[in-house]
């Protein structure tokens, strides 16, 4: 059987507030309108996960502006949540938007990998869906990918599909990721995420075509280096025959399977048991993984390597 991986995960959201206003977003709240997660509540939630097979704690944060007086407190909360997760025996992965060099270097201490969606490299989208989203500037996000490479951090990135990009722009975005990977070799997976309409978005953008998604997967597999794993979120491909077509085109990972998809809250995951059975009936073996791929275990600091070895042994 062909192995398909997934990450048994749970999401902590330090805050939903975000200074970006992407017109397709179903996650954000207005700055200062959201009550931040406290460390004590986070610890209680994580302690309640004992015995449920959860490995990855995805720390997924809305963005506080880099010049805000609250940026330091925001970052310290994100860092401390990673430390709490570590101390409770979990494996943190953080996605908190573009970070400074010092911020990303500190998060490396308490995370097994970091992530940031490239989304699309087209600056044209800054006049449409990203017109009120300063941190979606493509060069800023590409620079973040390079910075993670310079610092030797295993990294997840990806494309958001169906937000107004052209076929050529998709190809250019994949080429940009490939170029960064050829220089640094730190990108472990690329998510190909089809836009899926939700109740909170302000733009009338329709769902991305499953047939188009398969075409993009085929293109990505041709462009990206072989060591990069292609990932799709299975809850955003609800028709199982479409999911099988994605696997046939080159997808080998289904990402974090979580109780609630915080970015797409209208789309729920099947149970792992259901998904595993369906895949097995079609020749695929669903297997859990860590938020860092085995190739990159040696990139981690000694403390993180030790925590992995305890679990593996």
UniProtKB/Swiss-Prot annotation:
Q: Which Pfam families match?
A: Radical_SAM
Which EC class, in a word? lyase
Domain (Radical SAM core) spans 4-235
Q: Report which superkingdom the organism of origin falls in.
A: Bacteria
Q: Which residues bind [4Fe-4S] cluster?
A: 18, 22, 25
What reaction(s) does this enzyme catalyze?
A: 5-amino-5-(4-hydroxybenzyl)-6-(D-ribitylimino)-5,6-dihydrouracil + S-adenosyl-L-methionine = 7,8-didemethyl-8-hydroxy-5-deazariboflavin + 5'-deoxyadenosine + L-methionine + NH4(+) + H(+)
Entry GO MF terms: 4 iron, 4 sulfur cluster binding; 7,8-didemethyl-8-hydroxy-5-deazariboflavin synthase activity; iron ion binding; transferase activity, transferring alkyl or aryl (other than methyl) groups
Q: How is the cofactor bound?
A: Binds 1 [4Fe-4S] cluster. The cluster is coordinated with 3 cysteines and an exchangeable S-adenosyl-L-methionine.
SUPFAM superfamilies per the record?
A: Radical SAM enzymes
What are its cofactors? [4Fe-4S] cluster
Give the record's pathway: Cofactor biosynthesis; coenzyme F0 biosynthesis
Write the record's keywords in alphabetical order, separated by commas: 4Fe-4S, Iron, Iron-sulfur, Lyase, Metal-binding, S-adenosyl-L-methionine
Enzyme Commission identifier(s): 4.3.1.32
Q: What does this protein do?
A: Catalyzes the radical-mediated synthesis of 7,8-didemethyl-8-hydroxy-5-deazariboflavin from 5-amino-5-(4-hydroxybenzyl)-6-(D-ribitylimino)-5,6-dihydrouracil.
Which NCBIfam families does the entry link to? F420_cofG, PRK06245.1
Under the heading HAMAP family, the entry gives:
FO_synth_sub1 (MF_01611)
In the record, the note on similarity to other proteins reads: Belongs to the radical SAM superfamily. CofG family.
Q: How does it assemble?
A: Consists of two subunits, CofG and CofH.
Q: What is this protein called?
A: 7,8-didemethyl-8-hydroxy-5-deazariboflavin synthase
Which organism does this sequence originate in? Synechocystis sp. (strain ATCC 27184 / PCC 6803 / Kazusa)
Q: Which gene encodes it?
A: cofG
């Amino acid at each position: 059987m062909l192995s398909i991986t997934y990450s048994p995960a749970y999401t902590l959201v330090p805050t939903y507030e975000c200074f970006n206003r992407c017109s397709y977003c179903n996650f954000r709240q207005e700055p200062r309108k959201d009550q931040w997660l406290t460390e004590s509540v986070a610890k209680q939630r994580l302690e309640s996960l004992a015995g449920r097979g959860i490995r990855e704690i995805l720390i997924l944060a809305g963005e506080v502006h880099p010049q805000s007086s609250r940026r330091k407190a925001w970052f310290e909360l994100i860092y401390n949540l990673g430390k709490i997760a570590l101390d409770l025996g979990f494996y943190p992965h953080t996605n908190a938007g573009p970070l400074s060099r010092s911020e990303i270097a500190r998060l490396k201490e308490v995370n097994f990998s970091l992530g940031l969606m490239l989304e699309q490299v087209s600056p044209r989208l800054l006049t449409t869906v990203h017109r009120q989203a300063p941190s979606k500037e493509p060069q800023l996000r590409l620079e973040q990918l390079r910075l993670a490479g310079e610092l030797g951090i295993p990294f997840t990135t990806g494309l958001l599909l169906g937000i107004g990009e052209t076929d050529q722009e998709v190809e250019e975005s994949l080429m940009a990721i490939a170029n960064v990977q050829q220089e640094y070799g730190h990108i472990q997976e690329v998510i190909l995420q089809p836009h899926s309409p939700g109740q909170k978005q302000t733009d009338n953008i329709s769902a991305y075509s499953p047939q188009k998604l398969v075409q993009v997967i085929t293109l990505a597999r041709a462009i990206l280096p072989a060591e990069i794993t292609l990932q799709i979120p299975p809850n955003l491909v609800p028709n199982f025959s479409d999911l099988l077509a994605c696997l046939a085109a080159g997808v080998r990972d289904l990402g974090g399977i979580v109780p609630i998809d915080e970015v797409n809250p209208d789309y729920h995951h099947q149970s792992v048991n259901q998904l595993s059975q369906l895949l097995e009936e079609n020749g695929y073996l669903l297997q859990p993984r860590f938020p860092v791929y085995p190739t990159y275990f040696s990139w981690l600091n000694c403390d993180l390597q030790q925590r992995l070895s305890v679990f593996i042994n």
